[in-house]
Design a protein with these regions (language model features):
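Short amphipathic alpha-helix that is part of the acyltransferase structural core
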Residues: 1-34, 39-41
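Glycine-rich acetyl-CoA-binding "A-motif" of GNAT/NAT acetyltransferases
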Residues: 47-51
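Acyl-donor binding region in acyl/amide transferases
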Residues: 43, 53-166
Length: 167
């Protein structure tokens, strides 16, 4: 499995199609702020088959209280360090392959800080994600992300905060 950084309009259109077709509980491909996306390919097939996409973007503001507590920051300190946090804004797989989910997250943890620094000039120290209500975050737990709390959630469901950090 390989991650390919999304750069071209054709790749951006592919991300849009994957999200709209395979991510039904939040089917929008739009986001606000910074954003870096990758397409996920099976490197064991020729030609390589696209297995999904994953993306990070600007973190959330205001921050959830559990996140502030976990990282030991005030809201003001978080604001000062905002560009060191990224939100795993979307993760869509189009196929079910054993262990693929945690393999993708491992690659994301490797590539995200490099690309974040390259594109934005900031050191990425924290990746955060929100797991939709009714889901248990098993793929994140398999990659050793920690559940740090629950948010009030979107109007239709609660979500759990999970994070991975480089410390």
């Amino acid at each position: 499995m390989i991650l390919e950084l999304v750069k071209t309009q054709v790749q951006k259109d592919m991300v849009k199609r994957i999200i709209v077709k395979n991510h039904s509980y939040v089917p929008t491909h739009r986001s606000v702020g910074r954003r870096i996306d990758w397409l996920i390919y099976d490197d064991n097939t020729f030609p390589s088959e696209c297995l999904g996409m994953i993306g990070i973007g600007s973190s959330v503001y205001p921050p959830p209280k559990d996140l502030l507590s976990y990282v030991g920051m005030t809201k003001s300190e978080y604001k000062d360090n905002f560009n060191s946090f990224a939100n795993n804004w979307r993760y869509c797989l189009t196929k079910s392959i054993p262990n693929l989910g945690s393999q993708v997250l491992k690659q994301l943890r490797f590539h995200a800080p490099i690309e974040w620094n390259r594109k934005y000039g900031n050191f990425l120290t924290h990746l955060v994600t929100f797991v939709g209500g009714g889901k248990n975050g098993a793929v994140y737990k398999a990659d050793n992300w920690e559940m740090i709390g629950e948010t009030a959630g979107l109007p239709m469901h609660k979500s759990s905060s999970m994070k991975w950090h480089s410390k």
